[in-house]
Swiss-Prot record:
This is Endonuclease V. It is an enzyme of class 3 (hydrolase). PANTHER family: ENDONUCLEASE V. Its cofactor is Mg(2+). The lineage of its organism: Archaea, Thermoproteota, Thermoprotei, Sulfolobales, Sulfolobaceae. The record marks 73 as: Interaction with target DNA. It holds the Pfam family Endonuclease_5. Belongs to the endonuclease V family. GO terms for molecular function: deoxyribonuclease V activity; magnesium ion binding; RNA endonuclease activity, producing 5'-phosphomonoesters; single-stranded RNA binding. One of its GO terms (cellular component) is cytoplasm. InterPro entries: Endonuclease-V. Signal peptide: none annotated. Its EC number is 3.1.21.7. It is found in: Cytoplasm.
Length: 198
């Protein structure tokens, strides 16, 4: 149980983060090294893995970080559970763009975990999520957009949702989504599950 005053405080923090998100075109075609970060749980332990992958060769290296997680799962506040561990797992990894398992600005306060991490690290991030958290789906020119209060905040390709975190734009998300679910996130997911079992 999380006290109401703490959630209200965290909402204010999220609004502050959202005001500091920079939406600008990055250019997926310019990315030579891409990072992905994911997390798995066993009890109250979180197993986070950051993967850095060379786009051309497919070669990758990774870092893992294990830590205790005491904040409960509350939709819209995922960053409190996962961001600290994810940031530790990607420290020192070499990449141009970070993909985060979670939402960017396709979030009720436009401050999903990919936006939080992107702003805190001042780094280009895209959120890739498995389910919709907020907004309405609208099909336009063969692309499914996520609209929030009349604004396009994300896109859906297959069963995945892509939204800008920081220093990227919707076109970057579209270009990424057209390529299918990112391999670097598949690797991160596989490694979190493997490390959790060890």
């Amino acid at each position: 149980m999380v006290e109401k005053h703490l959630l209200e405080f965290l909402e204010k923090l999220q609004f502050l983060i959202s005001k500091n998100v920079k939406i600008s075109h990055y250019g997926i075609e310019n990315v030579k090294k891409i990072c992905g970060v994911d997390i798995a749980y066993k009890g109250n332990l979180g197993f986070s893995v950051g993967v850095s992958m060379d786009i051309n060769s497919g070669d990758y290296n990774y870092k893992s970080y294990v830590g205790e997680v005491n904040f409960p799962y509350i939709p819209g506040f995922l960053f409190m559970r996962e961001a600290p561990l994810m940031i530790k797992a990607i420290e020192g990894l070499d990449c141009h763009l970070l993909l985060v398992d979670g939402h960017g600005i396709a979030h009720p306060r436009k401050s999903g975990i990919a936006a939080v991490i992107g702003v805190l690290l001042d780094f280009p991030t895209i959120g890739v999520a498995k389910s919709r958290l907020t907004g309405d789906l609208v099909n336009e020119s063969e692309i499914t957009y996520v609209y929030l209060n009349g604004e396009k905040v994300g896109v859906k390709f297959g069963r995945y949702f892509y939204s800008p975190g920081n220093k990227v734009d919707l076109q970057d998300c579209i270009e990424l989504g057209k390529r299918g679910y990112p391999k670097v996130l598949k690797i991160a997911d596989m490694l979190t599950k493997k490390i959790k079992k060890e």
